[in-house]
């Protein structure tokens, strides 16, 4: 049997760590729901998927990093939704870490670029760009890793979209299409 490519899906926050909360919409819940859609699509396409949490539980950043680093996975995608002081802030951001290890930096940036392109193709959302970031889960992991911010809960128009499962499913489809595009090019 061919060994399946393994992918880590990391739903941000959880348990008593709510992330952003706007009205009845709680980031930790939306992160998990979107991550479940991503995991289901990946499994359907023949990948081995490991999630850092499958329920509404608290998992420390250190534990998330350890899960990823022990996993021997090909890559990790961390899923979050955004918040800003300004209600006008809108769009998707994808972060990678400028790793001193050149190959990991390049792989993570290539993954981020591929995912951004596919997500925009499907969702027609605004792009705030692929950026380098210093988040623990992308900095301290040893496999290529990105952190997706799937839109602003603090923006009314975007919140309206994020409330709809169909939008989260299309976001998930874009993330999966991007992962597959990245893996096909062999820039692992």
Regions found by a protein language model. Name each.
Residues 7-21, 93:
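Short, surface-exposed beta-strand segments enriched in small/polar/acidic residues
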Residues 25-188:
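Active-site-proximal helix/loop segments of hydrolytic enzymes
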């Amino acid at each position: 049997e061919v060994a399946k490519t393994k992918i880590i899906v990391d739903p941000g926050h959880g348990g008593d760590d709510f992330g952003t909360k706007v009205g009845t919409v709680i980031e930790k819940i939306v992160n998990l729901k979107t991550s479940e859609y991503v995991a289901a699509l990946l499994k359907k396409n023949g990948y081995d998927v490991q999630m850092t949490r499958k329920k509404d539980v608290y998992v420390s950043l250190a534990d998330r990093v350890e899960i990823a680093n022990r996993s021997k996975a090909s890559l990790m995608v961390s899923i979050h939704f955004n918040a800003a002081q300004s209600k006008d802030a809108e769009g998707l951001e994808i972060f990678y870490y400028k790793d001193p290890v050149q190959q990991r930096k390049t792989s993570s940036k290539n993954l981020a670029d591929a995912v951004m392109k596919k997500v925009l193709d499907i969702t027609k959302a605004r792009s705030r760009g692929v950026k380098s970031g210093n988040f623990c889960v992308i900095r301290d992991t040893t496999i290529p890793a990105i952190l997706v911010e799937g839109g602003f809960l603090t923006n009314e128009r975007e919140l309206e979209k994020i409330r709809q499962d169909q939008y989260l499913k299309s976001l998930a489809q874009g993330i999966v299409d991007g992962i597959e595009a990245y893996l096909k090019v062999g820039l692992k």
